[in-house]
Amino acid sequence: MRLVQRGVSLKPESELDAKLILAGVGGQGVLFATSIFSETALALGHDVVGSETHGMSQRGGSVISHLKIGAYESPMVRHGTGDVLLAFDWQEAYRTLAFLRRGGLCVVNGPGEGFWDPGVKGYLTANGIAAHVYAADDVAMSIGSPRSANLALIGYALSVPEMPFAHADIRATIERITPSKFREVNLKAFDAGYRRQR
């Protein structure tokens, strides 16, 4: 699928230029997470293009979402140019690291820093990539909503200084676009992830 939307409702206070990769497997809410960031950017008046690839319809299959915010025409993020990688599955982090530019940001749902292969750790260091690992699954389980790990990881990511979005803007979008029956638990997961890092 290709998403092309132009922010026309507001004139942005400042230009946002960001290329994001969101990666996971079917059933983890990768596409909903992508919507959170794209809807936030649009609400702030920015242009957005994006594309989702791979096994979206197959539960458990790889899902990779490309999202570019700013003056872009092509929706795909080329290898070595991405600013942010959000990996909702640690194995997908391995598969998608090459999308990040030197000095990029990687936030991974994983069991702890020790899961990185030594060779990958060397790659991260050599390329100046800021890598953060967060047990979002555990946080989601602790609040009784295992399917909300995506929101917990986003909350955590918003506490990282390099993340090019404001906490208040993302939270407002979650509140606005989440169906009413899931709104409370989604905000709870997001807030739990954000607080864990503060």
Annotate each PLM feature:
Residues 3-198:
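Active-site cofactor/cluster-binding pocket
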